[in-house]
Curated annotation (Swiss-Prot):
Its main location: secreted. This is Protein RALF-like 26. It comes from Arabidopsis thaliana (Mouse-ear cress). Disulfide bonds join C37-C46, C66-C72. The lineage of its organism: Eukaryota, Viridiplantae, Streptophyta, Embryophyta, Tracheophyta. The gene is RALFL26. The keyword Nucleotide-binding does not apply.
Length: 76
């Protein structure tokens, strides 16, 4: 029983060491990890990715004049 436990422990240690060796090349954090705007719930004030390259589009076209619905006098 003790021999099996020792073998299992050696296998587990070998797996952990191999995984840490595989990650040895990365010694820095990805900048996206620290950027709160790229997370799942960005705080207010964050803009969607690549939105600074797109032109702004108005929400609705505002016209300050008479329309058929208001029945005001037309200029014609």
């Amino acid at each position: 029983m003790k021999a099996w436990m020792i073998i299992l422990l050696v296998i587990c240690v070998a797996v952990v060491v191999e995984q840490s060796e595989a990650r040895k090349g990365r010694k820095y954090l990805n900048p996206g990890v620290l950027d709160r705007c790229r997370g799942p719930n960005p705080p207010a004030g964050c803009h969607p990715h690549n939105s600074h390259h797109k032109p702004r589009v108005p929400v609705h076209n505002y016209s300050r004049g008479c329309s058929r619905i208001t029945r005001c006098r037309r200029d014609a």
